[in-house]
């Protein structure tokens, strides 16, 4: 892999708890079109990784095809706040903003943040929550997601501390059991970040596109109304915007082949993401602060016009 390459990793759960890794160098600082095996007008993005067993190239596409079907049943739509008497979408946005900071402080993997948000929304879809308990639900879902995604999840005492001791260790343990029972222990869900990894690879993304796509996608987590869109649609739209912003064509035959969305389907989602970004609460700056650092390429200050 060339200097400056970035590795991203897809992890899928197989039978009996086995772990399947779809890991590959998705980003090259200087993409080399000659290195790809091309069939017709589309690239075989898995050809280079055929000898790497961790990339499960024999059935990686089947994993994503299954995920596209499953996201329909594991995603939520922005109607659940109508059944909440004590909280609203603004409070949800504040909670997610805080969780972005906590996630960064604990140095957790990106997928943990996306799974946390999914668990919160699915729980709120099923249970009414009081305002004082909302943060407890959030930190508990972070714990569950961490146990699922991380090698070393945060300790309970650290979660109690990060909540300024508003809840006890026992409160979190009891809420964990309650959340899992409510969700029928279904925590294996395809998130937007899961799809993003595949789409970045299909787009032969460079480091700038990766950072900008991640920035845009993280920003969607706070926007309650963007739950209208499926995770795969949001991921595809983030890649589309990032590609357009660095001067590439928004879409390509390879992206169409692997994402199964045409450009006309993605443009409305891309516009919704940028409109949500422009109208977001300026006080909720966790995502902006995160991506204003050198580690994330200072992409917060990137000008992203809506010109499509």
Regions found by a protein language model. Name each.
Residues 1-139, 143-308:
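Acidic, serine/threonine-rich low-complexity regulatory regions at protein termini
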């Amino acid at each position: 892999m060339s200097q400056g390459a970035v590795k991203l990793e897809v992890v899928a759960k197989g039978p009996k708890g086995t772990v399947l890794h779809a890991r590959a160098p998705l980003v090259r600082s200087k993409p080399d079109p000659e290195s790809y095996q091309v069939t017709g007008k589309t690239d075989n993005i898995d050809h280079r990784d055929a000898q790497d067993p961790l990339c499960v190239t024999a059935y990686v596409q089947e994993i994503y095809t299954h995920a596209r079907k499953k996201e329909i049943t594991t995603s939520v739509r922005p109607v659940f706040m109508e059944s909440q008497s004590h909280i609203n979408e603004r409070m949800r946005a504040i909670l997610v903003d805080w969780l972005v900071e906590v996630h960064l402080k604990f140095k957790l993997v990106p997928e943990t943040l996306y799974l946390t948000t999914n668990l919160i929304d699915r729980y709120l879809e099923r249970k009414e929550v009081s305002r004082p308990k909302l943060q407890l639900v959030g930190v508990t879902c972070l714990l569950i997601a961490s146990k699922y995604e991380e090698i070393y999840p945060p300790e309970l005492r650290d979660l109690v501390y990060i909540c300024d001791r508003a809840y006890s260790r026992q409160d979190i343990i009891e809420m964990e059991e309650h959340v899992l029972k409510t969700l029928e222990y279904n925590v294996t869900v395809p998130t937007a970040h899961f799809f993003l990894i595949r789409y970045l690879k299909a787009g032969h993304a460079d480091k700038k596109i990766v950072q900008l796509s991640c920035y845009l996608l993280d920003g969607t987590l706070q926007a309650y109304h963007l739950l209208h869109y499926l995770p795969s649609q949001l991921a595809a739209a983030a890649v589309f915007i990032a590609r357009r912003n660095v001067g590439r064509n928004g879409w390509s035959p390879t992206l169409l082949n692997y994402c199964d969305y045409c450009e006309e389907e993605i443009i409305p989602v891309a516009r919704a993401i940028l409109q949500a970004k422009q109208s977001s609460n300026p006080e909720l700056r966790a995502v902006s602060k995160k991506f204003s650092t050198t580690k994330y390429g200072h992409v917060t200050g990137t000008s992203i016009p809506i010109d499509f």
